[in-house]
Swiss-Prot record:
It comes from Ocimum basilicum (Sweet basil). This is Flavonoid 8-O-methyltransferase 1. The lineage of its organism: Eukaryota, Viridiplantae, Streptophyta, Embryophyta, Tracheophyta. Its EC number is 2.1.1.-. S-adenosyl-L-methionine binds at residue 223. One of its GO terms (biological process) is methylation.
C-alpha cells in the first residue's frame, strides 16, 4: 500500500495530493474572473436580455471562432464558480448562459459594481508582489510591494493613473453599499449625533448617505488635501484637507471605514489617539465615540469561504501596506492602548463589522 509521512492509506495520500493541486491552481479562479470582466461577458449577457448560447456569446464578444472551445471551457469553470448559470428551455435546445447574483455585481453600470475593484486587485504589477515575499522577509522594506517596486502604495497609485482610477471607483462603489446599509440597518448608532467626522472619507459617499438619513447631523469629511481639493460641500456636509496623524476636527463621533486595517498597530494607536482627542474636545463634554467599519477575524462562526476571504484580505494588507486584519482581541488591544475603555460590535456588514468604541 502506498504511504508517505503522516499518510496511512491510499485514499488519504490521494486526498492530500488533490488538496495540494487545488491550491497550486487556485489562482485560476481569480484569472478566469478577470478574463470574464475584461471580455465584458456579464454586460454582454445582460444587454442580450435573455440567456445566451455559446455561439451567440462568441459572436458578441467577438472572438476568433477557432477559439470557441476555449471560451466554452472558461465558461464551464465560471459556471462551477457560480458566476453564471446554464439553462435549457427545450430538451433539444442548445444550453445558454445567464447571470447570477454574483455576476450582476460585475456589471459596469451597476452602482455597486465590483469590477473596478477586481481589476485593481488582480493588476499584473500588484500581483507580482506576492512572488517577492520570501525575499522580503530578509530585508527592511515595510511591504513586499515596496520591496519589488521601490515605492509605497501611494507612489504606486500616483505613477499608475489607470490603476488609481480603478481602485478609487471600486472604493466609491463599496462606499455606496456600506452607506446605504448603515443608513437603514444601524440607525441607533447614529441617532442623536450632531456632528460626525469621516476620516479618510474620500469623496464622502458614506457621509452623504448618513447625513441624508439624519438631517440634523452635520458631517465633515477629512482626507488629504489633494483628495478633497475641488470637492464642494453642501448645507450639512463639508470637506477638510488634513492629516489624521496630526489632528482630527472636533465632533460627537469619528467614523473610520476600512482605514485602520491599512496601518500597523502602532500607527492605529496614533490615529485612535487623535480620534479620542476629537470626540472629547467636542461640545459633547461626556465624550462621544469612534465608529469603525472593518473586519474582525474569527468573530462568530462563519462559513469556510468567509473565513478564507478574510484571511486573503489579511495577506493583501501584508503584501501592499503595513496593515493587517485583526481578531477581536487584537482590536481590543489597540483600543485600550489608545485610551478607550469599552467597545460594542455589530456584525451587520457581511465579512465586516461595525464597532463602536467609547472613551
Amino acid at each position: 500500500m502506498p504511504s508517505s509521512s503522516g499518510v496511512d492509506s491510499t485514499q488519504e495520500l490521494l486526498d492530500a495530493q488533490a488538496h495540494i493541486w487545488n491550491h497550486i491552481f487556485n489562482h485560476i479562479n481569480s484569472m478566469t474572473l478577470k478574463w470574464a470582466v475584461q471580455l465584458g461577458i456579464p454586460d454582454i449577457i445582460h444587454k442580450h436580455d435573455k440567456p445566451m448560447t455559446l455561439s451567440q456569446l462568441a459572436d458578441a464578444i467577438p472572438i476568433n471562432r477557432a477559439k470557441s472551445d476555449a471560451l466554452h471551457r472558461i465558461m464551464r469553470i465560471l459556471v462551477h464558480s457560480k458566476f453564471f448559470d446554464r439553462v435549457r428551455t427545450l430538451p433539444n435546445e442548445e444550453e445558454a448562459y445567464c447571470l447570477t447574483r454574483a455576476s450582476r455585481l460585475l456589471l459596469r453600470d451597476e452602482p455597486l459594481s465590483l469590477t473596478p475593484f477586481a481589476l485593481a486587485v488582480l493588476d499584473e504589477d500588484l500581483m507580482g508582489t506576492f512572488h517577492c515575499v520570501p525575499e522580503w522577509f530578509g530585508n527592511e522594506c515595510p511591504s513586499p510591494l515596496e520591496f519589488k517596486h521601490e515605492k509605497s502604495i501611494r507612489e504606486f497609485a500616483e505613477n499608475n493613473q489607470r490603476w488609481s482610477l480603478l481602485f478609487n471607483e471600486g472604493m466609491a462603489n463599496d462606499a455606496r453599499l456600506v452607506g446605504s446599509i448603515l443608513a437603514k440597518e444601524s440607525r441607533k448608532v447614529f441617532e442623536g449625533l450632531e456632528t460626525m467626522v469621516d476620516v479618510g472619507g474620500g469623496t464622502g459617499m458614506v457621509s452623504k448617505a448618513i447625513v441624508d438619513a439624519f438631517p440634523g447631523m452635520k458631517g465633515i469629511v477629512l482626507d488629504l488635501p489633494y483628495v478633497v481639493s475641488g470637492l464642494k460641500g453642501s448645507g450639512n456636509l463639508r470637506y477638510v484637507g488634513g492629516d489624521m496623524f496630526h489632528s482630527v476636527p472636533p465632533a460627537d463621533a469619528v467614523f473610520l471605514k476600512w482605514i485602520l486595517h491599512n496601518w500597523s498597530d502602532d500607527e492605529c494607536i496614533k490615529i485612535l489617539e487623535k480620534c479620542k482627542e476629537a470626540i472629547t474636545t467636542s461640545k459633547n463634554m461626556k465624550g462621544g465615540k469612534v465608529i469603525i467599519v472593518d473586519m474582525i477575524l474569527g468573530y462568530e462562526k462563519q462559513q469556510d469561504e468567509a473565513v478564507e476571504t478574510q484571511l486573503f484580505f489579511d495577506m493583501m494588507m501584508m503584501t501592499t501596506l503595513t496593515g493587517k486584519e485583526r481578531t477581536e482581541q487584537e482590536w481590543a488591544k489597540i483600543f485600550f492602548a489608545a485610551g478607550f475603555k469599552t467597545y460594542k460590535i455589530y456584525p451587520l456588514l457581511g465579512l465586516r463589522s461595525l464597532i463602536e468604541v467609547f472613551p
